[in-house]
């Protein structure tokens, strides 16, 4: 499973805590993240994470392109709906693409936990079957 990680600045520490809590499950998957999020997650967990550009410098667009090409299976996007800054990822573009390509997406820690537990139980195996990987 290819999981993309994005976090607004005010949610990056929460992303690190989430990844630390679920390091065992995440370690069994391929992780992709935007610039600063990679460093924070890797420093907290030691997990290998494929590095993209920072969100405000094209990283969100890289993830969007990967979604469009079928290269992302899940998006964990910890957003700050109140304090998002200019230059942070375009939320609606990413969410629209996830809807168009049937990509499970979490925009907060509660939904991310539901997806991670579903991944652990095998509830999301249909994704790789649909993409012809198993």
Predicted feature locations:
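Histidine-anchored nucleotide/phosphate-binding helix
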Residues: 13-22
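Short hydrophobic/aromatic-enriched beta-strand-loop microsegments
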Residues: 30, 47-58, 126-129
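Mid-chain, well-packed structural core segment of small domains
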Residues: 60-100
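Short internal beta-strands
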Residues: 28-37
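Short, glycine-/small-residue-rich phosphate/pyrophosphate-handling segment
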Residues: 110-134
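Short, acidic/small-residue loops that bind anionic groups at enzyme active sites
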Residues: 95-115
